[in-house]
């Protein structure tokens, strides 16, 4: 009916124009009449015309009318309805790989698989943390240190709320002036990332008279803008590399972190560095190769086997999220969001994957258990506001292998990209990123399992089957 009404209005309008032309002067514009110059506009009897080219001629065409009503129509595309997997999975407990890495056996302070290790930040709860600006007589700070940190604190808190699905939150205690640390800043000069307990002890002692450290679980130091004393970063954590608790009048500080000059260069930032280091306070592992932090060895994938697809692989991105496996082992991926199957029982299965950062119901990760220490994980990715925009960071599916015999900082998660993919450059100040996201129609096969992305809309629809 809407189409008929619109046609009737246009028909009546055409008749009105036709009859009106009988009394128009010769120079007046008439629909279909000749005009002199393309683009010329003229109004006659409240109807606007524009001169357009029609074949070899130039003619007047109605542009708009002050009296004619315009009817617009829109097409509403219904949201894609979520559909459950076509086969029933195994118990999600079957996908709780038990860690068997040399690193865990030797140190026992960070985990890459089950059971999780506690002792520092709990997997749920609210954590009080402090931002403490610090300067020295020979390295004075600017007038308003919080001006460059307030948005960073919010991004930090929002990120943890997203990846934990609200299970953890942070309360920030801030001091709006620089705390003057005695002596020279050069005493604490640090060229590479690592512990800096002497600096932290001196800074917290200087801050103690001004700041109430009651209940503070971690301190994030903010050095002066533009400083070059701390080139990369300085951090230490309970049970890892903190030599001893740092005393205050209200209780000991067990974790600290300081973002150095490296993070002053955009698009790097403070908040993603704080997130990465806070991940270690939750006892989560580095997914990068820690023995190759400065590119000492040329590698096919420079950062490590998970490239730039996890905050615990590279806080600079491009993808600044947390993989479904790390969410699973810490308790941030609900069991109902996981499809688990043992390889022996795997039949061809179609699964709709809900993008991993969504807060809606649906399977977010499909895991196929290959052995007691190995799993293939499949998850849906979407670019997010936390990310650094890059060609490799796009909508699609990520497939990777988890090896529970490989520990913290040794590459426990390995991407499985489609055949022929390589490294892609980016504007995130990171090395080339492995082009690992599956597009629609792409498939990968590993460890006897084939994963194919068959559709991508609100959800990513995949097919998983035994190879061959």
Where do the protein language model's features map onto the residues?
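Bacterial N-terminal signal peptides that target proteins for export
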Residues: 1-12
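C-terminal segment of classical bacterial N-terminal signal peptides
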Residues: 19-26
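Secreted, propeptide-processed cysteine-rich mini-domains
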Residues: 28-42
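Extracellular disulfide-bonded cysteine-rich modules/repeats
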Residues: 45-53
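Extracellular mucin-like PTS domains
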Residues: 66-77, 87-88
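Zn2+-dependent metallopeptidase catalytic core
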Residues: 81-267, 274-275, 388, 450, ...
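Non-catalytic C-terminal accessory/binding modules of secreted extracellular proteins
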Residues: 81-85, 97-98, 142, 239-264, ...
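Extracellular hydrolytic enzyme modules, especially secreted metalloproteases
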Residues: 226-388
């Amino acid at each position: 009916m809407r189409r008929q009404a619109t046609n009737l209005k246009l028909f009546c309008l055409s008749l009105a124009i036709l009859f009106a032309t009988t009394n128009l002067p010769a120079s007046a514009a008439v629909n279909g009449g000749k005009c002199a110059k393309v683009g010329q506009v003229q109004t006659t009897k409240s109807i606007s015309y524009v001169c357009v080219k029609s074949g070899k001629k130039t003619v007047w065409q109605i542009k708009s009318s002050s009296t004619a009503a315009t009817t617009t129509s829109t097409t509403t595309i219904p949201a894609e309805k979520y559909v459950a997997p076509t086969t029933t999975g195994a118990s999600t407990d079957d996908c709780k790989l038990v860690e068997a890495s040399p690193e865990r056996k030797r140190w026992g302070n960070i985990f890459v698989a089950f059971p999780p290790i506690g002792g520092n930040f709990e997997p749920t709860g609210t954590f009080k943390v402090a931002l403490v600006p610090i300067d020295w007589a020979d390295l004075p700070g600017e007038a308003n240190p919080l001006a460059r940190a307030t948005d960073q604190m919010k991004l930090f808190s929002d990120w943890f709320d997203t990846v934990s699905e609200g299970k953890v939150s942070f309360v920030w205690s801030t001091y709006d002036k620089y705390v003057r640390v005695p002596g020279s800043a050069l005493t604490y000069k640090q060229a590479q990332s690592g512990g800096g307990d002497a600096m932290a002890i001196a800074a917290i002692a200087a801050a103690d008279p001004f700041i109430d450290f009651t209940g503070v679980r971690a301190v994030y130091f903010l050095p002066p803008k533009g400083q070059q004393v701390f080139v990369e970063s300085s951090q230490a954590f309970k049970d890892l590399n903190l030599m001893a608790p740092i005393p205050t009048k209200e209780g000991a500080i067990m974790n600290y972190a300081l973002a150095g000059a490296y993070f002053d260069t955009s698009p790097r930032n403070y908040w993603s560095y704080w997130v990465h280091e806070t991940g270690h306070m939750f006892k989560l592992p580095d997914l990068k190769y820690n023995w190759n932090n400065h590119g000492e060895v040329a590698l096919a994938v420079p950062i490590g086997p998970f490239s730039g697809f996890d905050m615990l692989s590279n806080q600079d991105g491009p993808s600044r999220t947390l993989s479904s496996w790390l969410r699973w082992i810490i308790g941030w991926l609900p069991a109902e969001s996981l499809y688990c199957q043992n390889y022996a029982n795997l039949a061809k299965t179609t699964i709709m994957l809900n993008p991993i950062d969504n807060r809606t119901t649906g399977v977010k990760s499909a895991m196929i258990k290959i052995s007691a220490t190995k799993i293939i994980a499949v998850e849906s990715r979407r670019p997010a506001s936390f990310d650094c925009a890059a060609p490799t960071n796009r909508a699609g599916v990520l497939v990777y292998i988890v090896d529970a015999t490989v520990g913290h900082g040794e590459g426990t998660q390995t991407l499985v990209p489609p055949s022929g993919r390589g490294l892609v450059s980016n504007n995130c100040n990171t090395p080339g990123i492995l082009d690992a996201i599956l597009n629609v129609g792409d498939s990968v096969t590993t460890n006897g399992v084939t994963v194919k992305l068959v559709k991508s809309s609100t959800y990513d629809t995949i097919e998983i089957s035994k190879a061959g």
